[in-house]
């Protein structure tokens, strides 16, 4: 089954003429690397999409993809800082004036500042749920042995590749903040100058594997062949992600930082690790069957509300070919209707 949702990316296609000015962190990129140099002149920026794709652009503007990394704003409708910077906290040895960018807005917020001319991630984060400061050390991450000192945790090497668009490992610069149109559709200059279906990447027109790779490039815990970058340097939408990134896989009966012993997710950013284990993945379903990244009325950009069973029951309701072997949902779950135990995701996600 494959629904006719148009794309996984942030904007259906790109149009109008122009170019984006590369911006971003300072610092020395690698002198030699196995990946090709990124031609940032081929990027035009998401604002160029609006003229021809306004509905998709407007929807994307309200998504979490467009709110991933932003300058600090403490009040008003465009507020980006929700952490409490008043007073002192033993976990926080930096102040709001030191913050250059804010990462995240839903579960937690991390903060980027400049140290010795390089942008780094500060060692404390704000929990949006618990409303308090927490240490951010990264001890369980594979890159920690190389970056035990937080002053070496380069925003560009560990974060920017998935939090910005058109990041170049050599120049240590990005084209646009946040996960914008060209993050999922690839460089759009050629298409903007002469719009055609075949001169822009449309994830909806890719094979199932390559379409899913677009999402997994940032929604899959793993590592590259080297130890320098924590994102798939060199990958472009439409390419085979496995040539740039190796996703972690669970080991039966073993609990890791990413997985419980039964193989289910132990932390965030592992959707791309658990989904390939599922029957849905092996049946040809794509991320876009359940998620609409051009914008949705629901959290997590799902096509139907995910905080109920509505989304799952679209395909798995009683009487459906792939539904439960019972007449009613509560007969299937053995839990009272509307209770937590009756929610599909409690057992199946």
PLM segments and residue spans:
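A gly/proline- and charged-residue-enriched helix-loop-helix capping module
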Residues: 139-143, 152-159, 164
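Second-shell loop/turn segments in exported
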Residues: 45-46, 145-149, 171
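Sec-dependent N-terminal signal peptides
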Residues: 6-12
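Hydrophobic alpha-helical membrane-insertion segments, chiefly the h-region
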Residues: 12-23
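Positively charged n-region of N-terminal signal peptides that target proteins for export
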Residues: 1-4
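Primarily the internal scaffold of c-type cytochrome electron-transfer domains
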Residues: 22-40, 47, 55-131, 135-140, ...
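Short glycine/proline-enriched loop/turn "hinge" motifs that connect secondary-structure elements
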Residues: 150-153, 280
């Amino acid at each position: 089954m494959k629904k006719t949702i148009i794309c996984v990316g942030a904007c259906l296609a790109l149009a109008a003429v122009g170019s984006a000015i590369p911006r971003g962190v300072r610092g020395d990129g690698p002198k030699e690397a196995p990946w090709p140099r990124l031609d940032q002149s081929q990027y035009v920026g998401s604002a160029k999409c609006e003229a021809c794709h306004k509905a998709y652009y407007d929807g994307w503007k309200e998504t979490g993809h467009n709110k991933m990394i932003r300058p600090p704003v403490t009040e008003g409708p465009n507020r980006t800082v929700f952490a409490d910077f008043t007073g002192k906290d033993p976990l926080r040895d930096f102040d709001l004036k030191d913050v250059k960018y804010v990462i995240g807005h839903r579960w937690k917020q991390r903060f980027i500042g400049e140290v010795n001319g390089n942008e780094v991630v500060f060692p404390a984060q704000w929990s949006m749920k618990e409303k308090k400061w927490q240490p951010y050390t990264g001890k369980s991450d594979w890159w920690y042995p190389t970056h035990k000192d937080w002053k070496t945790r380069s925003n560009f090497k560990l974060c920017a590749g998935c939090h910005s668009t058109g990041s170049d490992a050599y120049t240590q610069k990005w084209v646009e903040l946040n996960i914008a149109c060209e993050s999922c559709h690839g460089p759009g200059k050629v298409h903007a100058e002469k719009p055609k279906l075949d001169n822009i990447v449309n994830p909806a027109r890719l094979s199932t594997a390559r379409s899913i790779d677009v999402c997994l490039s940032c929604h899959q815990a793993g590592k590259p062949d080297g130890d320098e970058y924590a994102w798939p340097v060199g990958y472009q939408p439409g390419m085979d992600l496995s040539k740039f990134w190796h996703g972690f896989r669970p080991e039966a009966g073993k609990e890791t930082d990413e997985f419980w012993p039964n193989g289910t997710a132990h932390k965030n950013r592992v959707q791309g690790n658990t989904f390939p284990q599922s029957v849905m993945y092996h049946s040809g379903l794509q991320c876009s069957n359940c998620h609409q990244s051009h914008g949705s009325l629901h959290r997590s950009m799902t096509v139907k509300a995910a905080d109920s069973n509505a989304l799952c029951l679209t395909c798995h309701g009683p009487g459906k070919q792939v539904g439960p072997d019972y007449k009613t949902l509560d007969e299937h779950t053995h839990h009272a209707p509307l209770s937590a135990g009756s929610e599909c995701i409690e057992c199946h996600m």
